[in-house]
């Protein structure tokens, strides 16, 4: 079988290597770091472990595995460990919570199973009622959210891709309090400003995350039962080596050579030249323009768009900090959101999920640390409350102080120290993401920024296969079903890169499976109806009927069920019948029901 060089040892590159090696290819992987896993790797705090204990586990940001992660989970299911498979090391989170400043309690929310489309309205109304938002805000938001649920894929890609999530939601019409939450939630979840992220991407992922709470079971919103490298990447690397993959850590690639519409070789930074039949470029978006030469761009317009792209306009920061505590503070059994925190914080208390590893203080550090709260910081351009500078303009010490104070403001009560959840004397030490480089002063350099999918970004993003005969791409900016810069998106991109090679060499092996995002069947009929409307140049049925509130949306869904007697269309329903159904239903639903 042919030989392959993979440039980049993150999830995209390792996935491509895994799939190709399983199919008999000769694979070499090169990465500038000695640690594998890219942004997802663990970052041990050097020198913190004593007397045989491991170093304290830092990270770029905590990892979570929601229900819609399919590709990553499939890969984990195929990586052996001494006692089973990597998938067995995932742990269910049973709840999440929102901590607001000046509130005596946190708002915990558990999952609720939804069976009918209009039950989404009831669930969202219940959730927002607990947070005491203005009913008018809740009514409009729920109606707009349900409009997205019931929009066809064609409308999402053709219309919503080109507007922001803020514009789709009509964000300017909400109260200042609700607007603050609308801005906070996408930032904390996926590091996106709703005024910048496309409605197609943010709507799709928001829908998946909402649906994650519309079901129960161990496949919902999971976390790893230990540090990511220890639990996942170490066994993955061992498995890749058992498949014959040769891994070259700490070996940066300097350049690619091109001739006759093909890559002819790779030059390493030490001057060594290496060759293969096929090449997988799996480096981050910040790095890929430096690897694409003008000659490569002349062959493939998609590569040229990447080479000349204004990367700063496409990316944002989401960076993690970990607080090591003398005692464990469990908070909630899941993720905790801080909508009032100006720096867009989300956290998880991790040792409660690591019980199988034994007592935390016996395994990590000096024996003094018993707790770990891992925090993601999603907003780096707004001033803090206590330091009053943007995070980018702060020293690491100032960042650690500000984030700690923002968490205390949300978690502690007004009743005084006896009731405080976080106390300064609990804090042993902290670790800030190693990928922030302060060597040149402030602001730091961040080489692991996230693609934020602004409106129209899909047209800039390349397919996995390029116009260069033996070059494919495997990173989270590649076009995928996932359509989000995540571990899932990177894994799917790696699979698509492997498939592109399989097609080009006419390999007699099975293709690597890729799967679209799954949506509940209860919305099928609505999406089919909207597809007809969109292709006829008409607006969504909610807009045609002037529906602007959740109660109206719920009433429409209930009346549709009463008119048609169905809540999904059989797969055998042809386009003619669907078209007739559109006209009939719109005509009847437009009439006011008799009293």
Go through each PLM region and give its residues.
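C-terminal auxiliary extensions adjacent to catalytic cores
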Residues: 543-595
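Glycine-rich FAD pyrophosphate-binding loop
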Residues: 21-48
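Conserved beta-strand-loop-beta-strand element in the redox core of flavoprotein oxidoreductases
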Residues: 256-274
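Active-site/ligand-binding neighborhood in enzyme catalytic cores
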Residues: 141-259
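Dinucleotide-binding Rossmann-like beta1-alpha1 core, especially the glycine-rich loop
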Residues: 50-141
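C-terminal segments that line or cap access tunnels to active or ligand-binding sites in enzymes
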Residues: 214-222, 276-278, 283, 287-461, ...
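Active-site-proximal substrate-binding core of FAD-dependent oxidoreductases
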Residues: 500-555
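N-terminal Rossmann-like FAD-binding beta1-loop-alpha1 element of flavoenzymes
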Residues: 2-29
């Amino acid at each position: 079988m042919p030989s392959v060089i993979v440039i980049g040892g993150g999830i995209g590159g390792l996935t491509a290597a895994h799939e190709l090696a399983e199919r008999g290819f000769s694979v070499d992987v090169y990465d500038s770091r000695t640690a594998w896993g890219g942004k997802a790797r663990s970052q041990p705090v050097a020198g913190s472990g004593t007397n045989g204990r491991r170093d304290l586990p830092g990270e770029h940001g905590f990892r979570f595995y929601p229900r819609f992660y399919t590709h990553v989970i499939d890969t984990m299911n195929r990586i052996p460990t001494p006692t089973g498979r990597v998938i067995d090391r995932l742990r269910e989170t049973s709840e999440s919570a929102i901590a607001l400043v000046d509130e005596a309690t946190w708002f915990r929310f558990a999952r609720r199973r939804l069976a009918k489309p209009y039950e989404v309205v009831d669930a969202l109304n219940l959730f927002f009622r607990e947070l005491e938002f203005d009913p008018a805000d809740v009514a409009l938001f729920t109606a707009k959210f349900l409009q997205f649920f019931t929009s066809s894929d064609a409308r999402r890609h053709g219309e919503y891709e080109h507007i922001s999530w803020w514009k789709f939601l009509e964000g300017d019409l909400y109260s200042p309090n609700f607007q603050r939450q609308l801005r906070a939630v996408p930032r904390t979840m996926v590091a996106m400003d709703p005024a910048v992220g496309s409605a197609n991407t943010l709507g799709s992922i928001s829908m998946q995350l909402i649906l994650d709470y519309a079901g129960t079971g161990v496949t919902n919103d999971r976390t790893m039962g230990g540090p990511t490298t220890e639990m996942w990447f170490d066994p993955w690397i061992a498995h890749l080596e058992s498949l014959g993959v040769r891994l070259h850590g700490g070996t940066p690639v300097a350049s690619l050579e091109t001739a006759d519409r093909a890559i002819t070789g790779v030059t390493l930074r030490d001057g060594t030249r290496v060759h293969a039949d096929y090449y997988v470029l799996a480096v981050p978006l910040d790095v890929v323009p430096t690897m694409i030469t003008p000659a490569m761009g002349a062959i493939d317009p998609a590569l040229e768009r990447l080479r000349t792209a204004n990367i700063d306009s496409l990316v944002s920061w989401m960076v993690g900090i970990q607080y090591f505590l003398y005692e464990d503070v469990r908070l909630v059994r899941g993720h905790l959101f801080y909508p009032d925190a100006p720096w867009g914080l989300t956290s998880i208390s991790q040792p409660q999920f690591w019980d199988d590893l034994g007592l935390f203080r016996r395994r990590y550090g000096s024996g003094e640390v018993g707790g770990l709260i891992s925090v993601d910081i999603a907003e780096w351009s707004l001033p803090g409350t206590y330091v009053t500078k943007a995070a980018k303009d702060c020293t690491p010490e100032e960042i650690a102080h500000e984030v700690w104070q923002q968490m205390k403001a949300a978690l502690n009560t007004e009743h005084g120290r006896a009731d405080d959840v976080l106390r300064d004397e609990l804090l042993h030490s902290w670790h800030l993401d190693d990928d922030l480089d302060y060597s040149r002063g402030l602001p730091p350099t961040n080489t692991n920024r996230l693609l934020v999918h602004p409106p129209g970004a899909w047209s800039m993003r390349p397919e996995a296969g390029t116009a260069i005969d033996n070059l494919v791409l495997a990173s989270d900016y590649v076009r995928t079903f996932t359509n989000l810069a995540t571990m899932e998106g990177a894994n799917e991109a790696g699979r698509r890169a492997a498939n592109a090679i399989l097609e080009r060499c006419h390999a007699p092996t099975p293709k690597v499976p890729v799967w679209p995002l799954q949506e509940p069947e209860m919305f099928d009929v609505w999406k089919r109806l909207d597809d007809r409307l969109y292709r006829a140049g008409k607006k969504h049925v909610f807009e045609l009927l002037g529906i602007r509130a959740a109660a109206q949306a719920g009433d429409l869904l209930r009346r549709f069920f009463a008119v048609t007697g169905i809540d999904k269309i059989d797969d055998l329903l042809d386009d003619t019948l669907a078209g007739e159904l559109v006209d009939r239903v719109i005509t009847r639903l437009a009439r006011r029901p008799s009293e």
